[in-house]
């Protein structure tokens, strides 16, 4: 938030010049505005339900009680922190959690003092929905206004960097493409560990040596200093911090971790100790990921089952008529966390022994495949029973395709970061499949490329990416000739 950002010194050590004479007032205005929205939405809901703006005594008590709970919850949640550089969705999730907490406290209060006998539940429900919509709309408009101001050069923080390494160049490129973040990287102070000039690619000016940093800060307006040095240069970093003790300003460490095989890296604080998460899946990364992905999977799986059950029944009859054996083929696969589960398919091959250790993918003109099974595999209809895996929770609609258990044993020794694909649930379709990496992988480089797409999906996951993959599956994958 703009108002919280202007008063960032409330939460972090910062330069006195950041403390605009309006910042404290602006923060107070935002807090009062949020509380006013809570009360106003209650009055509007009362007007809609009862046709008057003047609430009866029990409703006035309910509004006053909820206002008190709002003060408590809005203070406990990080609503008024600096959201600079963070997405709007993250802010709205916190807002929703805070407002949900308000009404959770009100619900407990109502049960204890039996408010439900005096207050309409319809009014409470309308109040909650209206209040949440109003707060979300207000924050969205405020964020849009803030972004517009920053693209015009207003409320932009100036940053200098000690050291010029790959992470800094990546951030510099990001900031140049996203002016709404409101940060301007002014230049860097050179160190022996910097990138070669040929690698820099961008014209960040050199401001001198680290010895000149303090003098530069005295003569120029700078809001943040970033330190980008190798992790092994602990003494050098400590020396820089000691110099900066003489000049209070925000200081950030930009560690160079790009060679560590990162996956969804983030930072957090446990107790009073800062911790960097180097590798984590969606489950550990974000509660939003867990809830949104689970809801999406269950809803789409139920819809698919309701719409496709006649086709699945017809396929089951066709499988039974094509060759002796069961309708479904069940095979051990590795899923979330590398745990084994049984994946279901319509059987497309003649019954054979699948318990050996030899890795044998289906190949072109494979004699094990029945004629009807060949049609199922080309059209990907053999994958439909995996809807039951999704409903059971062992798979997702979209995710890295689960490989046979023997493949994991084989490829984890040959491909770096191969097992990182198990940070999420496997999917019926995936990012690699819609990009042409489906079916047989006769060469190691083909499998490596598939794994790259799997990890890229985990890093980039969003609901929109899942929808895109589902659409592309229908357009590109169904009938693809690489499936035998």
From Swiss-Prot:
- Tell me, which GO biological process terms does this entry list? colanic acid biosynthetic process; polysaccharide biosynthetic process
Pathway where it operates: Glycan biosynthesis; xanthan biosynthesis
Q: Name one GO molecular function term.
A: undecaprenyl-phosphate glucose phosphotransferase activity
Task: Offer one Pfam family short name for this entry.
Answer: Bac_transf
Q: Which UniProt keywords apply?
A: Cell inner membrane, Cell membrane, Exopolysaccharide synthesis, Membrane, Transferase, Transmembrane, Transmembrane helix
| Transmembrane residue ranges | 37-57, 59-79, 93-113, 122-142, 299-319
The chemistry this enzyme catalyses reads: di-trans,octa-cis-undecaprenyl phosphate + UDP-alpha-D-glucose = alpha-D-glucosyl di-trans,octa-cis-undecaprenyl diphosphate + UMP
Q: How does it sit in the membrane?
A: Multi-pass membrane protein
- Localization annotation: Cell inner membrane
Q: List the disulfide bonds.
A: none
- GO CC aspect terms: plasma membrane
What effect does gene inactivation have here? Cells lacking this gene fail to synthesize any xanthan biosynthetic lipid sugar intermediates. They do not produce xanthan and exhibit a 50% virulence index reduction.
Recorded hits in Gene3D superfamilies, A to Z, give: NAD(P)-binding Rossmann-like Domain (3.40.50.720)
Entry coiled-coil feature ranges: none
Top EC class, one word = transferase
tRNA processing listed as a keyword = no
What is the predominant subcellular site recorded for this chain? membrane
Q: What is its EC number?
A: 2.7.8.31
Q: Which NCBIfam families match?
A: EPS_sugtrans, WcaJ_sugtrans
According to the UniProt entry, the note on domains is: The C-terminal domain is sufficient for glucosyl-1-phosphate transferase activity.
- Family the entry assigns: Belongs to the bacterial sugar transferase family.
Q: What does this protein do?
A: Is the initiating enzyme for the synthesis of the exopolysaccharide xanthan. Catalyzes the transfer of the glucose-1-phosphate moiety from UDP-Glc onto the carrier lipid undecaprenyl phosphate (C55-P), forming a phosphoanhydride bond yielding to glucosyl-pyrophosphoryl-undecaprenol (Glc-PP-C55).
The protein's name: UDP-glucose:undecaprenyl-phosphate glucose-1-phosphate transferase
Q: Which organism is it from?
A: Xanthomonas campestris pv. campestris
């Amino acid at each position: 938030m703009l108002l919280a950002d202007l008063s960032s010194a409330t939460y972090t050590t910062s330069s006195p010049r950041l403390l605009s004479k309006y910042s404290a007032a602006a923060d107070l205005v935002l807090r009062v505005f949020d509380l006013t929205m809570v009360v106003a939405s209650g009055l509007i809901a009362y007007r809609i339900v009862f046709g008057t703006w003047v609430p009866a005594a029990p409703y006035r008590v309910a509004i006053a009680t909820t206002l008190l709970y709002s003060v408590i919850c809005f203070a406990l949640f990080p609503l008024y922190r600096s959201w600079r550089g963070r997405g709007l969705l993250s802010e709205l999730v916190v807002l929703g959690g805070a407002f949900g907490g308000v009404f959770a406290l009100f619900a407990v209060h109502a049960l204890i003092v039996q408010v439900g006998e005096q207050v309409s539940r319809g009014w409470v429900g309308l109040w909650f929905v209206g209040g949440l919509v109003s707060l979300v709309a207000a924050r969205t408009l405020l964020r849009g206004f803030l972004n517009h101001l920053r693209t015009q050069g207003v409320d932009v923080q100036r940053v200098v960097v000690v050291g010029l390494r790959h992470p800094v160049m990546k951030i510099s490129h990001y900031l140049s493409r996203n002016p709404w973040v409101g940060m301007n990287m002014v230049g860097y102070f050179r160190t022996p560990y910097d990138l070669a000039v040929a690698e820099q690619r961008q014209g960040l000016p050199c401001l001198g040596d680290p010895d000149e940093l303090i003098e530069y800060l005295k003569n120029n307006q700078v809001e943040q200093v970033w330190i980008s040095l190798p992790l092994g240069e602990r003494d050098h970093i400590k020396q820089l911090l000691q110099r900066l003790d003489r000049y209070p300003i925000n200081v950030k460490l930009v560690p160079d971790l790009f060679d560590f095989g990162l996956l969804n890296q983030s930072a957090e604080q446990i107790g009073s100790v800062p911790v960097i998460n180097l590798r984590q899946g969606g489950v550990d990364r974000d509660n939003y990921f867990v809830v949104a992905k689970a809801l999406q999977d269950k809803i789409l799986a139920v819809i698919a089952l309701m719409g496709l059950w006649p086709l699945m029944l017809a396929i089951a009859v066709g499988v039974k008529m094509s060759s002796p054996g069961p309708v479904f083929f069940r095979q051990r696969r590795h899923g979330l966390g590398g745990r084994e589960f049984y994946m279901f398919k319509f059987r497309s091959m003649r019954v054979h022994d699948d318990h050996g250790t030899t890795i044998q993918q289906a190949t072109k003109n494979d004699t094990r495949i029945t004629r009807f099974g060949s049609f199922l595999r080309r059209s990907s209809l053999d994958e439909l029973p995996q809807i039951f895996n999704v409903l059971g929770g062992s798979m997702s609609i979209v995710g890295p395709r689960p490989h046979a258990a023997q493949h994991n044993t084989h490829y984890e020794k040959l491909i770096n970061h191969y097992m990182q694909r198990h940070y999420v649930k496997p999917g019926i379709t995936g990012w690699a499949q819609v990009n042409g990496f489906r079916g047989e992988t006769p060469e190691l480089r083909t499998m490596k490329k598939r794994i790259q797409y799997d990890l890229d999906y985990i890093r980039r996951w969003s609901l929109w990416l899942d929808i895109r993959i589902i659409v592309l599956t229908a357009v590109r994958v169904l009938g693809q000739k690489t499936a035998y």
